[in-house]
């Protein structure tokens, strides 16, 4: 037995494994005298493959090494025994420890039954052959049995008929460090290959994994041209798949590249959140590449450690596809001139949400980047492909809605090509290797046809109330946009006081806090979806462009946006990927007089469908959202109390910060500061007095909190007749017993904002 085990071990070491081996027919599990321990043969243990790091190259010729823990080794009478301390270490013996294969140890067995161990050098000629005949037969039987098991379990990938023994020895996951065969399924996407062309297995695998079974219109038109190396200027509505329209051609170039380090694509986005989103999207599509080279696709944005980004760029094979914001990328290449030489060799340059380049003040950093890279590429006589994508390419969209009169605006001309005008403007700033191909996936509609627009008219001081009404009446995932950061903070505190899950995101927050709030918003929305409660994200226009937050049902414009392009991008956060959504404008009388009319005329369909029989239909293209006055009246007192508490919290926090800042500044300067000095400054005095007037005393705050909590405990009712549940037009008792109707408003039917607007249009 000892000789057999050692010979088997020697053979396996020469072959590919670390453990000992014996035939399955003769390997027997043995129950020891100790009830807690089981003596087993080496072949019956659950050996685990040893992962070989890439840094160790060929690991001195060793392959197929296996290990096991929780198993002891004993030498009894010169015989090696493996002792398993628990049953889980034994193959298939967890529930069959008392089977007929187990025998009791006979410690008094005659020593003649044991095979004497001899050194290989001491053996006579022919002795090894004679002694190993039975062993060879047993091993042959073992290999046959194991091959049958492989056929049953389906683990026969890579098996070759001529080398069955070698493949049996190498049945560890030695080569799985590069690719996991179990995760790869055959990709059959006929619509992609027919409409777009031949794509690599990596791309098809990523599309299959994400469930993208067919290309969108912009992808269908842009990808074939991009694969040919043409410069492209693409326009498509929000949520139409523009990221993959330029992402897939870049990944295809990466797959065809002969170099393992040369940069392929450089993608610029206007916001950090959009850069992270694009990076995550590309990493999912190219998951097979990322598994092998984790840093091949990198995001370089501000708000995060620049030292870490510099370190990542130094890894071999890193940064082959870079998604960046212009500010951070410019900072990196100015610090390290070798990066200029490196990224001047890119094959493709992409500008996502490129309409921002038309606005003054947004192009300076990007223009400097183009100068650095362009100068170096010119020396190398190298030209890159340029692709520009956005949802809006019209110069009139960037005019301030509050400035010019809507009456002086020109009606859009049918013969005037907006993209041609924009292209002439861009060609003065960006160097194209040839005239770009213009692709317009939605030439008529500026706002996606999947978005149902609506309007709420109210006083300027009632915006909070109508936001509360909307999220109470139509629970779901809602995104509210404000023009000012102070409004974002106030509305967030206001809704939280009303026990509504609310999160905020704005430019004053650090990048980590923004991303953390987005994650928390997603997690909370999943919980509230089950409970039928609303989840709200309040943001400034930093969240308006490109962010793909799954499942946004409603977008509310707390303030009318300053420009029409911002309205288009805000509304585009809903109705993504062929879904429908609702966009609601809360408009004061002052806004309705000029900015609203100008917005509607700017967004008018240039095909002429909005002008019927001389009437300007564009003035009445927005549906008024129905308001239930009985519900609204019950919310007014709650809204007032929550608003006062929110004002108090913000004013107190602001006063405390101001006081801390003044004291710290005085301490740094070594100056004594007196409260009377603050009053001498007229501006500071007015600001401080304004904040102090909004603060409450401790007792006063407690009273307001108690009153608000008392009101929040009372359920909202559609019918205010509370004496008899069965009275009135609605049988409240029946609705309560059968659990029908609205989750939080007794007597009200379960409503959906999208269906409400659709039904109103039909009427």
Swiss-Prot record:
One of its GO terms (molecular function) is RNA binding. InterPro entries: DEAD/DEAH_box_helicase_dom, DEAD_box_RNA_helicase, Helicase_ATP-bd, Helicase_C-like, P-loop_NTPase, RNA-helicase_DEAD-box_CS. Residues 18-35 have a biased composition (Low complexity). Residues 104-114, 136-160 have a biased composition (Acidic residues). Keywords: ATP-binding, Helicase, Hydrolase, Nucleotide-binding, Nucleus, Ribosome biogenesis, RNA-binding, rRNA processing. It is found in: Nucleus, Nucleolus. Residues 450-619 form the Helicase C-terminal domain. Residues 223-411 form the Helicase ATP-binding domain. Its EC number is 3.6.4.13. Residues 1-35, 87-169 are annotated as: Disordered. A motif (DEAD box) lies at residues 352-355. One of its GO terms (biological process) is maturation of LSU-rRNA from tricistronic rRNA transcript (SSU-rRNA, 5.8S rRNA, LSU-rRNA). It catalyses: ATP + H2O = ADP + phosphate + H(+). PROSITE patterns: DEAD_ATP_HELICASE, HELICASE_ATP_BIND_1, HELICASE_CTER, Q_MOTIF. It is an enzyme of class 3 (hydrolase). GO terms for cellular component: cytosol; nucleolus. Residues 115-127 have a biased composition (Basic and acidic residues). A motif (Q motif) lies at residues 192-220. ATP binds at residues 236-243. ATP-binding RNA helicase involved in the biogenesis of 60S ribosomal subunits and is required for the normal formation of 25S and 5.8S rRNAs. Belongs to the DEAD box helicase family. DDX24/MAK5 subfamily. The Q motif is unique to and characteristic of the DEAD box family of RNA helicases and controls ATP binding and hydrolysis. This is ATP-dependent RNA helicase MAK5. It comes from Vanderwaltozyma polyspora (strain ATCC 22028 / DSM 70294 / BCRC 21397 / CBS 2163 / NBRC 10782 / NRRL Y-8283 / UCD 57-17) (Kluyveromyces polysporus).
């Amino acid at each position: 037995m000892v000789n057999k085990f050692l010979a088997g071990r020697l053979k396996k070491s020469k072959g590919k494994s670390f453990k000992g081996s014996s035939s399955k027919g003769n390997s027997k599990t043995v129950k020891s005298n100790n009830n807690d321990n089981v003596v087993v043969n080496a072949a019956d243990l659950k050996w685990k493959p040893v992962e070989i790091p890439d840094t160790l190259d060929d690991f001195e010729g060793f392959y197929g090494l296996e290990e096991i823990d929780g198993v002891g080794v004993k030498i009894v009478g010169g015989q090696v025994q493996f002792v398993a301390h628990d049953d889980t270490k034994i193959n298939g013996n967890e529930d069959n420890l008392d089977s007929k294969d187990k025998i009791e140890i006979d410690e008094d067995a005659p020593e003649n039954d044991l095979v004497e161990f001899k050194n290989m050098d001491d053996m006579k000629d022919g002795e090894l052959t004679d002694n190993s005949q039975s062993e060879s037969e047993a091993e042959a039987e073992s290999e046959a049995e194991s091959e049958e098991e492989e056929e049953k379990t389906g683990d026969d990938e890579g098996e070759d008929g001529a080398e069955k023994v070698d493949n049996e020895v190498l049945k560890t996951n030695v080569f799985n460090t590069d690719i996991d065969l179990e995760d790869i399924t055959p990709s059959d996407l006929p619509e992609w290959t027919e409409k777009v062309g031949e794509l690599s297995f990596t791309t098809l695998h990523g599309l299959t994994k994400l469930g993208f079974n067919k290309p969108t219109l912009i992808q269908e038109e842009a990808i074939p041209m991009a694969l040919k190396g043409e410069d492209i200027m693409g326009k498509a509505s929000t949520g139409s798949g523009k990221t993959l329209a330029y992402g897939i051609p870049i990944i295809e170039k990466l797959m065809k590249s002969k170099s393992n380090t040369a940069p392929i694509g450089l993608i610029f986005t206007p916001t950090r959140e959009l850069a992270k989103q694009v990076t995550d999207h590309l990493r999912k599509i190219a998951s097979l590449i990322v598994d092998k080279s984790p840093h091949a696709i990198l995001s370089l944005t501000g708000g995060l450690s620049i030292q870490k980004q510099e370190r990542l760029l130094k890894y071999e094979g890193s940064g082959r596809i870079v998604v960046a914001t212009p500010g951070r990328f410019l900072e990196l290449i100015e610090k390290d001139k070798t990066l200029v030489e490196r990224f001047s060799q890119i094959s493709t340059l992409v500008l996502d949400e490129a309409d921002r380049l038309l606005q003054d003040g947004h192009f300076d950093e990007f223009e400097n980047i183009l100068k650095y890279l362009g100068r170096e590429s010119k020396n190398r006589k190298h030209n890159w492909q340029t692709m520009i994508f956005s949802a809006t390419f019209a110069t009139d969209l960037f005019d301030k809605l509050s400035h010019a009169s809507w009456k002086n605006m020109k009606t859009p001309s049918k013969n005037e090509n907006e993209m041609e005008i924009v292209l002439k403007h861009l060609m003065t700033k960006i160097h194209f290797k040839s005239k770009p191909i213009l692709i317009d996936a939605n030439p008529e509609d500026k706002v996606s046809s999947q978005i149902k627009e609506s309007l709420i008219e109210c006083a300027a001081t009632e915006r909070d109330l109508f936001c509360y009404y909307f999220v109470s009446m139509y629970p779901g995932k809602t995104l509210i946009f404000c023009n000012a950061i102070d409004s974002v903070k106030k509305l967030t505190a206001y809704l939280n006081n009303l026990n509504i899950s609310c999160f905020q995101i704005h430019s004053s927050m650090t990048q980590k806090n923004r991303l953390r709030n987005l994650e928390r918003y997603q997690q909370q929305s999943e919980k509230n979806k089950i409970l039928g409660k609303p989840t709200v994200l309040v943001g400034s226009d930093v969240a308006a462009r490109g962010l793909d937050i799954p499942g946004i049902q409603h977008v509310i414009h707390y303030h009318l946006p300053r420009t029409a392009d911002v309205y288009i991008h805000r509304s585009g956060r809903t109705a993504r990927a062929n879904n429908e959504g609702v966009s609601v404008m809360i408009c004061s009388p002052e806004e309705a007089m000029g900015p609203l009319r100008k917005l509607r005329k700017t967004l008018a369909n240039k095909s002429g469908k909005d002008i019927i029989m001389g009437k300007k239909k564009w003035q009445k293209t927005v549906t008024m959202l129905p308001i239930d006055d009985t519900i609204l009246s019950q919310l007014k007192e709650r809204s007032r109390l929550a608003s006062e508490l929110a004002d108090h919290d913000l004013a107190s926090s602001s006063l405390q910060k101001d006081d801390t800042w003044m004291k710290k500044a005085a301490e740094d300067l070594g100056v004594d500061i007196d409260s009377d000095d603050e009053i001498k400054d007229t501006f500071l005095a007015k600001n401080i007095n304004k904040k102090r007037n909004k603060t409450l005393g401790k007792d006063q705050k407690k009273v307001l909190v108690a009153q608000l909590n008392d009101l929040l405990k009372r359920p909202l009712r559609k019918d205010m007749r509370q004496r008899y549940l069965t009275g009135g037009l609605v049988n409240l008792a029946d609705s309560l017993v059968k659990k029908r109707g609205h989750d939080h408003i007794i007597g009200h039917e379960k409503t959906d904002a999208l269906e409400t607007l659709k039904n109103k249009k039909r009427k």
